[in-house]
């Protein structure tokens, strides 16, 4: 049986388009386990706002037994953050979330828990402050 690669996606600033983009993952038939390293509540809120009827489930990047996601499902490694997202308004309060998402994906790749990572748009001015 062929191993299915595990790809970690970091969607970037939660007020930006990256969270919208990852909500379209279920439309594609990727031959990989796709995991989004993000805040699951922010992602669920965005799905509701965009009227996306998809399942969003919490998983661990470090689960070696993870199988390809179910149809119409997004797997999320939850990065905990409290706060509010105003779409289109980057907020320096989200910088720790963005950096933690990147660090989590990098560590998973370096530790051989993931085969690749893909980054969404990062608001550099927000994380520089």
Feature-to-residue mapping (PLM):
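Contiguous, glycine/small-aliphatic-enriched amphipathic segments in soluble metabolic enzymes
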Residues: 1-129
């Amino acid at each position: 049986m062929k191993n299915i690669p595990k790809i970690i996606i970091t969607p970037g600033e939660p007020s930006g388009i990256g969270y919208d983009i990852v909500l379209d993952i279920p439309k594609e038939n990727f031959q990989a386990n796709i995991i989004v390293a993000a805040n699951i509540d922010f992602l669920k809120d965005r799905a509701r706002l965009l009227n996306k009827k998809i399942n969003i489930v919490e998983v661990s990047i470090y689960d070696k037994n993870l199988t390809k996601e179910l149809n119409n499902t997004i797997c999320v490694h939850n990065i905990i953050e409290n706060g509010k997202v105003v779409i289109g308004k980057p907020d320096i309060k989200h910088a720790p979330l963005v950096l933690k998402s990147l660090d989590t994906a990098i560590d998973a790749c370096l530790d051989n828990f993931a085969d690749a990572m893909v980054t969404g748009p990062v608001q550099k001015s927000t994380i520089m402050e």
